[in-house]
A protein has these predicted regions:
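N-terminal accessory segments
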Residues: 1-44, 73-77
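N-terminal glycine-rich flavin-associated loop
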Residues: 21, 46-78, 96, 102-137
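Generic beta-strand/beta-sheet core signal
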Residues: 33, 81, 101-103
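Short hydrophobic/aromatic-rich motifs at helix boundaries and adjacent loops
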Residues: 38-40, 100-103
Length: 137
């Protein structure tokens, strides 16, 4: 699978970007170590593998908003990732982009059995949904 060629101007921003991201999400919320990034180089579709510049793991909606504003200002590509179980290639990282890891947003908000609909946060895995509705057929 061919992916877009990374932009060298974006890659050159990496260290400054990491500092700005760490100001928004402190502690272990920014992953930039090459070995740790391997866990994020693909989703459930493992044919394509590419480590992103960084992975950011926000815990609040405000942090998500601040990250998106920062990336917009710096023209950084953002790939949102929920639980990382997709087999469709929906969360394929880019070398000159970041992964916005939304796995901490993992609540099932509403189950509407009558309309066969479930409203969830992006970090909810399909298995969790199946288990939540299993007792009601």
């Amino acid at each position: 699978m061919l992916m877009p060629k990374p932009e060298s101007e974006i890659l050159a921003q990496r260290e400054g970007l990491l500092a700005d991201l760490r100001a928004i999400v402190p502690g272990e919320g920014v992953i930039a170590d090459n070995i740790a990034l391997r866990a994020y180089e693909s989703d459930g579709l493992s044919v394509y593998r590419q480590a992103p510049m960084a992975v950011v793991l926000p815990e609040t909606v405000k942090q998500v908003s601040n990250i998106m504003q920062l990336c917009d200002r710096r023209q950084i590509k953002v790939v949102p990732r929920g639980a990382g179980t997709s087999l469709s290639g929906g969360a394929l990282p880019l070398e000159d982009g970041i992964i916005l890891g939304l796995g901490k947003f993992n609540k099932i908000l509403e189950i509407d059995y009558e309309n066969r609909a479930v409203r969830v946060q992006p970090g909810v895995a399909n298995l969790a949904i199946s288990q939540a509705v299993d007792d009601n057929g």
